[in-house]
């Protein structure tokens, strides 16, 4: 057994086992989280009360009516505290269908047994998170979903855990994801592209204002609600869970010389059949890439691979890649394997080409070029969304009310649990995946998941 040494007041050496050190760390983290939560909860209550008082000032109510609303608010706060004390578990939900699958977990459509409300449940295996050193990414996912409480981010209602798994209970968006929509369509019109790129830009800008960088903007993570409007998902989780999102996966490729690749580039002559075959090949392999542990680096900005630091501008690069895919039918750097895609991304000055047989406007082309360029001059890198508002391609966009308008492509939803816009997983059991409960020392690091549990205040209205 490993141990660590320290000294007592007299200078004598004291040896502590790793088991003792882990227990001490767990106690320290538990206490820190307890008092941190008290401060956070107090601040949240003050914010909710301040919001109520601001609303009361704007309403023409008598003092008696205002007092009644204050009493109702106090009752809601009391009920929320009671709800937070209730222990939530996987047994409180009935699994209806598997609607998503990744390298280390799955997403299920579930129904809460006591209320009948339908949610999307993401299940992540703790052992995988520890083994792959993904705890920080899992924590980022949970923390961003807690903080980003607005219309452009998928809403999380609960998070909890058991000895084996972590669970995120989120709103179910029946429209599916942008990847599925793009696979159904050959290409989108420029009007449709303008709509979805505008909504994605608003979503990206909203999380940047909160101080977060998504780092994994791609069609898979753009979800559509029942009206066809867009929301962002998978914050910090997919970035890193897949090998392709870890720089060391490509480190052995970084020695490749540009000249090694330019010859390959030259061989990709853009004849009509080439573009058509590339689109067909991309769609044929896209689904498998989404579910694999390898994934694809198609949407990742070059500076993310360089290990020289990156900022919010990397998300705007990804938006340019998605815009290209919407108009062309495939992303600009797609290849037969991730290694070649990586080389194309790193040599974007030579590889970002627009095949003449797929005509797009000069305004669209210029916008893509200004997204997929050097980070310091990239569209969105200076003033965020404000950079886009003066771009000709976005002329006519009602940035303030776009979500209130009809979506570019209507979504057909027949019921609250309609999953027709999702893949079928007939070979996957509905039973929540489990693993042997860790034994002995294996459970020692479970303290890293302390404070994972969460219940949203608004969920009180659903109970």
From Swiss-Prot:
Annotated compartments: Cytoplasm; Nucleus
Top-level taxon of the source organism: Eukaryota
Gene3D superfamilies referenced in this protein's UniProt entry, alphabetically: Phosphorylase Kinase, domain 1 (3.30.200.20), Transferase(Phosphotransferase) domain 1 (1.10.510.10)
Swiss-Prot/TrEMBL GO biological process terms: antennal morphogenesis; chaeta development; dendrite morphogenesis; dendrite self-avoidance; imaginal disc-derived wing hair organization; imaginal disc-derived wing morphogenesis; intracellular signal transduction; microtubule sliding
Domain (Protein kinase): residue spans on this chain: 93-394
Residues annotated as the enzyme's active site: 216 (proton acceptor)
Activity control mechanisms: Activated by fry.
Reported cofactor(s): Mg(2+)
Binding site for ATP: 99-107, 122
Effect of residue 292 to A: Excessive dendritic branching
Known outcome of mutating residue 453 to E: Constitutively active kinase; reduces microtubule sliding to similar levels of wild-type (in vitro)
GO cellular component terms attached to this protein's record: axon; cell body; cell cortex; cell hair; cell periphery; cytoplasm; dendrite; nucleus
Outcome following mutation: residue 122 to A: Loss of catalytic activity; increases microtubule sliding (in vitro)
Tissue expression summary: Expressed in the peripheral and central nervous system (at protein level). Expressed in the wing imaginal disk.
Reactions listed under catalytic activity: L-seryl-[protein] + ATP = O-phospho-L-seryl-[protein] + ADP + H(+); L-threonyl-[protein] + ATP = O-phospho-L-threonyl-[protein] + ADP + H(+)
Keyword Membrane: no
Pfam family, one: Pkinase_C
Residue ranges constituting the AGC-kinase C-terminal domain according to the UniProt record: 395-463
The family this protein is said to belong to: Belongs to the protein kinase superfamily. AGC Ser/Thr protein kinase family.
Name under which the protein is recorded: Serine/threonine-protein kinase tricornered
